[in-house]
Amino acid sequence: MKVAIIAGKCDGCGVSTYLFELQKAFNKYAGTCDYYVYDCPSFFKENDYNLMKKLNVKTITRADAAKINNYDIVFAAYHVVRSQVTEDEANGYYDMLEYDITHPLKVLIFNEHRPSSIIKHYANGTINKYCLRLNFLLSFDKIMQFGSNITTAVFLKDLIGEAEYMKRFTPLYHLYEFNNIDNWVPAAAKIKAIEYLGRAALFKDAHRLIRANDKLQKAGYIVEMRGLGYKETLENLPDFVYESDGKYGVDRTKKSPITYWISPNEDQYKLLDLPIEKRNNKIYCYGNYNKYEIYNHLNRVAYACDFFNLPHVEDYADSLMEYCMCEFIDNGIIPILDNNFGSNSNIIVDGKISNTKFNETCAGIFLNKDLSNIDEVIEKMDYLYNNPIEYDKFRKESLEIWKEHCNPKNIIENLLENIYK
């Protein structure tokens, strides 16, 4: 079987990571797979080209799109940031999918979860236009299927009917190959630290670590945050940079007393060994990082957190998650996760959704949004950190849960079964 993946852009976000993992899984378990990115200069930043070259991603234009007709299946990502491209550039990508690629089965990948973005895509009719010409839709199930609460949009299922929609729909499950256990740092050699890795996007809830900082540092934990783009942080979390004015804003003449920002020109890892007593109760904040090198340094920390959560997480597929959750445990770090995610998401066993919730297992340690269980969480963290045998047992059990949940072989088999049913 020959499979092609096409995207409008290539970067380090979860959409691109999913496509990379999909490519690896098809190459390993179901034939051959090539990954193409539409060749439009506006779609990329310079470092994205370096990422593409490293991962052997090919470029394609409308002129040479006919080569894709030699594939059996094409997975096309609805993945264009319109604010960064002209309308003609974006339409060139969509027209290529619609008109130039005619032979293979065409599967649209739509892994969007923000209502505002979904409204935008539906409101102008673009996604319906292309879905009607594609054979299948791969997406988080309930947000597409039952998202009628977004009243301004005309949904695809309303245009083609529920029965036809269900014929075309197949759920999107995150797949990931765990293979790093040989590089795990021994539990007894771990640094008593917790790291946040991610952007300042509101649904990642970086603010939770700010609110938990005082108790964590009093318990002896170094607290650091990485991946916070300065501009996005100023827009979404200004009190990470400036001091709160005591009302609903910040005083831009005063730096935040909580965070300490490290210049991108400095060594991004040399301060990891700085003792907690010299940190003045501050969270050390770093900018963007290289995901392919960061764990060579951070695999020494005991914990990492990702508080990804959505207001209606129960309305999404059980695999709606963040890839850094997998990366934490793949590198031997116990994850601290959002309890709303943990209590509303079921783990996958043998390729099927089970009745077991994430927070009923050792998949991680789960912290409430309001920090109401922070004392219990710190007690659990302390127990594991102070007992290396128990720490090692916990992370190995967690690894097995995540390996089963994201098993690429099972997911690819089920995906092909749904497409060819």
PLM feature spans:
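A short, active-site helix/loop in glycosyltransferases that binds the activated sugar's phosphate group
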Residues: 115-169, 176
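A charged, aromatic-enriched C-terminal amphipathic alpha-helix characteristic of glycosyltransferases
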Residues: 14, 372, 376, 385-420
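A short, glycine/small-residue-rich beta-strand->loop->alpha-helix junction that serves as a flexible
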Residues: 6-20, 203-204, 315-319
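Conserved donor-binding/catalytic core segment of Leloir-type glycosyltransferases
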Residues: 4, 183-204, 210-217, 224
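Nucleotide-activated donor-binding/catalytic signature segment of Leloir-type glycosyltransferases, i.e.
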Residues: 235-295, 300-303
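Nucleotide-sugar-dependent
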Residues: 292, 306-326, 337-346
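Active-site proximal beta-strand in glycosyltransferases
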Residues: 72-79, 89-129, 144
